[in-house]
Amino acid sequence: MNYMDQYKFWLEDSYFDEGTKEELRKIADNQAEIEDRFYKDLAFGTGGLRGVIGAGTNRMNIYTVRKATQGLANYILKQGGADKGVAIAYDSRYYSPEFADEAALCMAANGIKAYVFDELRPTPELSFALRTLGCISGIVVTASHNPPEYNGYKVYWEDGAQVTAPKDHEIIDEVEHVTDFHTVKTMSKDDAIEAGLYQYIGEEIDVAYMEELKKQIIHPEIIKEVADELKIVYTPFHGTGNKPVRRILAELGFKHVYVVPEQERPDPAFTTLDYPNPEDPKAFTLALTLAK
């Protein structure tokens, strides 16, 4: 199908929800926008998915997330890993919780148990969780440092790292073979929970993660010397780090931790930042002001 055929298919097929169709009706007179949304499938590359949020085959939405997850599920099933399950985490971006749920429910419908964090968590904790739980794979819904209109989907393997060759290309091949949305499996959350295929994870993993972090300290005696007086300024950039970073610093005894108040809470719009990238010195303007 060409891009107009795809556009009409999404408008007319009963598989797609009314909200999606209404979004597409609003661009009926914008040929360039229709083409951009439908001229290709959102590429599933070595890093997973990443794209602008919206309706269309070339956008991040519940349907492209389901399609990618079905491909990953097919690969897991061929590897005999269904019994191990998949751990899923997500960040503070628009629709991250919804995309995480869609991935979990697709996995569950394929007979693969999904362990889903009860709220946003940083990516390293996802890596820790999937190893701790003995999962075969992990998914993080995040677009890292991209602008607010983006979201993404990263795949991790049982070693806790992002998938590498040859697995990455094998998973890509499975995703590309999912060409019919009607073949993508899903189920309700209530049914998945009742079947034991959807399980929330949270505090128990947090505790274990914090304890493991403490084991990585190279010079604990130095922390004891300076913890009472050292002043630390921290900013989570509206993302996932606020709770875990403050928690580990408190548990280590640091008494003077100052979090940038304007950037403390999760905010999918990244309101105080032009570009939410810690490699950009300008992103630390508020933190440096607080420090001074």
Task: Kindly give the residue locations of the regions a language model identified.
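Polybasic, low-complexity association/targeting segments
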Residues: 1-7
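An N-terminal, well-structured beta->alpha segment
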Residues: 7-103, 192-229, 240
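Gly/Ser/Thr-enriched, mixed-charge loops and adjacent short helices
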Residues: 33-38, 42, 151-283
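Solvent-exposed alpha-helices and their adjacent loops that cap or buttress functional pockets
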Residues: 36, 79-82, 130-133, 146-148, ...
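Conformational gate/switch positions in structured elements
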Residues: 46-48, 146, 236
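Short, well-ordered alpha-helical packing segments
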Residues: 73, 104, 108, 127-131, ...
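N-terminal small/polar loop signature for handling phosphorylated ligands or for N-terminal nucleophile
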Residues: 87-150, 253-292
